[in-house]
């Protein structure tokens, strides 16, 4: 038993070195992308913004069917027609992911009309842009239900069948604010941190589930109407991401079976800095970069 444990202690660091080298090689050499021609994709919040761009990207890359969920029928109709004109079968369903029973009922309707969903993209989110003291007590549960609990419910609705088929992928469009919160968006930051923990736990839980994987995407501020008015101090140094870029990189991450994607890549430095710098230094970074007050000019869509 002792020799077995000693052997494991020797093998483990060698395993780590191998995996790091393998990942480094993967950054240099082009990897084979997953074929999407047999995949049925469901995107929550699919009517506009990043959701609409995701639908376009999946269609361009050959997804078999695309299903859109959202609360605004006009936007869903427009996106559905656009995807159909691209030659991809597309359907939309009115569904508030913050309503548990509505999620389960709509998921059943999707299975009956479209078939099994093999790629679920949890993209729907809301932001109120208020500090704790200014926030509406009735609005706070809404952000938690849509941004966090909605992912619990959609995943519970579709994951069991993915496990049966041994084919599935759960995607979470999160935010870098899950790792580094800002004042003035306390409800959004809290819900995104919860969603990040949910996906981290889910990803580890799927390790022994063949054919089923998960991807968490953490983008920087994206230029959509949802965060309209948000400003940082040096916009040329920290420009907002384009939704097309976020969508393209997200679908690529799915095709590469990448568990975690930070956008842009410089956001990896954020994790390192938070691990080594004292709190006072981190506070100065927030003030210097303008993230401390960036939400003051917020006038986006809630």
From Swiss-Prot:
This is Short-chain dehydrogenase/reductase 3. It is a multi-pass membrane protein. The active site is at 188 (proton acceptor). Keywords: Lipid metabolism, Membrane, NADP, Oxidoreductase, Transmembrane, Transmembrane helix. The chain crosses the membrane at residues 9-29, 170-190, 195-215, 253-273. Belongs to the short-chain dehydrogenases/reductases (SDR) family. GO terms for biological process: regulation of retinoic acid receptor signaling pathway; retinoid metabolic process. It is an enzyme of class 1 (oxidoreductase). It comes from Bos taurus (Bovine).
């Amino acid at each position: 038993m002792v020799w077995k444990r000693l052997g494991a202690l020797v093998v483990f660091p060698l395993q780590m070195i191998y995996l790091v080298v393998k990942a480094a090689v993967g950054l240099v050499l082009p990897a084979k992308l997953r074929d999407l021609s047999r995949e049925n994709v469901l995107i929550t919040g699919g009517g506009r913004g990043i959701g609409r761009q995701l639908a376009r990207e999946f269609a361009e890359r050959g997804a078999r069917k695309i299903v859109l969920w959202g609360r605004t029928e006009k936007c869903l109709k427009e996106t559905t027609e656009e995807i159909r004109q691209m030659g991809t079968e597309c359907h939309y369903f009115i569904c508030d992911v913050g309503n548990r029973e509505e999620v389960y009922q709509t998921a059943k309707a999707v299975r009956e009309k479209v078939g099994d969903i093999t790629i679920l993209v949890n993209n729907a989110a809301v932001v109120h842009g208020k500090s704790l003291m200014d926030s509406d007590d009735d609005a706070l549960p809404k952000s938690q239900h849509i941004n966090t609990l909605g992912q619990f419910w959609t995943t519970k609705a579709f994951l069991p069948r993915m496990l049966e088929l041994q084919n599935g992928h759960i995607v979470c469009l999160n935010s870098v604010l899950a790792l580094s919160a800002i004042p003035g968006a306390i409800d959004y930051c809290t819900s995104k941190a919860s969603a990040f923990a949910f996906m981290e736990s889910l990803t580890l839980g799927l390790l022994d589930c063949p054919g089923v994987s998960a991807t968490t995407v953490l983008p920087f501020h994206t230029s959509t109407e949802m965060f309209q008015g948000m400003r940082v101090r040096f916009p040329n140094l920290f420009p907002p991401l384009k939704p097309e870029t976020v969508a393209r990189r997200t679908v690529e991450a799915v095709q590469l079976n990448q568990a975690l994607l930070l956008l842009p890549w410089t956001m990896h430095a954020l994790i390192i800095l938070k691990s080594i710098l004292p709190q006072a230094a981190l506070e100065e970074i927030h003030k210097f970069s303008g993230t401390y007050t960036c939400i003051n000019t917020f006038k986006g869509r809630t």
